[in-house]
Each structure stands twice: as C-alpha cells, then as structure tokens.
Amino acid sequence: MFISRSPDETVALGERWGREAQSGWVIGLTGDLGAGKTQLVKGIARGLEVIARVHSPTFALLHEYNDGRLPLFHLDLYRVETRAEMVAAGLEEYFCRPNGVTVIEWAERWLDPVSSFESQVAGSRLRRVRLEVLSDTQRRITYEDSGP
C-alpha cells in the first residue's frame, strides 16, 4: 500500500513501476474519476522512457506509445460497457501484448464475472491496482502482483 499526498507522488510511484516493467506486463487500474489513474500512467510512461505526452484515451479508447524502452499500450475502458464493444473496437488484442506493457484504466469493465483477472492474462505478469480518494490531495494506492 502507498499513500500519495500529491499528483507528483503518484507520478513518481508510476515511474518506479515503469522502470521495473518488462515485456508482457499488464497493469489494471481501478478507481473513481479523479483518483489518479492517468497520473499513474504518466509515471509508468516516464519510467519506460516514453517521450510523447501521455494523456487519457477516454474518447480514443487506446493510445500506443512506441518511442520508449518498451511499447506502452494505454487503454481506457470508461466508455466501454460490454465485452462485445471491446471486441468490436479491437481492444482485446491489446490486453496481453507480449512485446510491451499494457495499462488498462477502468480495468473492472474488462473483468469477466465468471473468470478471474489472472486467467484472462495467463502467462503475463499482472499488477492489479486500486486507487482510492482519501482527501483532495491524498490517495491510497493498493496493488497486488500475480503471474511470472
């Protein structure tokens, strides 16, 4: 567990994760609007040495960044309501990209109610992250890793 006291601290945590990230990693982010999911992704991108400006792909659903140490696939499922919409948009192929790091905002929308997150990313390292708003400036960030 990590308590972030500012957006900069959230970015710094993400940067540490980005530095340790390896091909095939999947990071699923959950939390309310404004909890800091995109700030964490900005840090992950910085740790991966991504040069491009990172912002939430809420309307595009997906942003690919190929200018860093590893490709970063940043998905935002906020506007996606069903698995059929994910498939129609071609998003499922990005959930477990072996050649890069996939970060999924609103990952709970991807979860299949009858199967676990782990089975959907079999063979990948999965970090499940929950961001909670504690105050205007503080966030509780809890995470759990599974897989190789």
Per-region residue spans from a language model:
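Short phosphate-coordinating micro-motif centered on Lys-Gly-acidic
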Residues: 1, 46, 81-148
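Phosphate-binding P-loop
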Residues: 17-24
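Hydrophobic anchor at the beta1->P-loop junction of P-loop NTPases
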Residues: 27-29
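The conserved Walker
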Residues: 33
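N-terminal pre-Walker A segment at the start of P-loop NTPase domains
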Residues: 1-16
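Short beta-strand-centered segment that lines the nucleotide-binding/catalytic pocket of NTP-utilizing
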Residues: 50-65
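Conserved lysine of the Walker
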Residues: 37
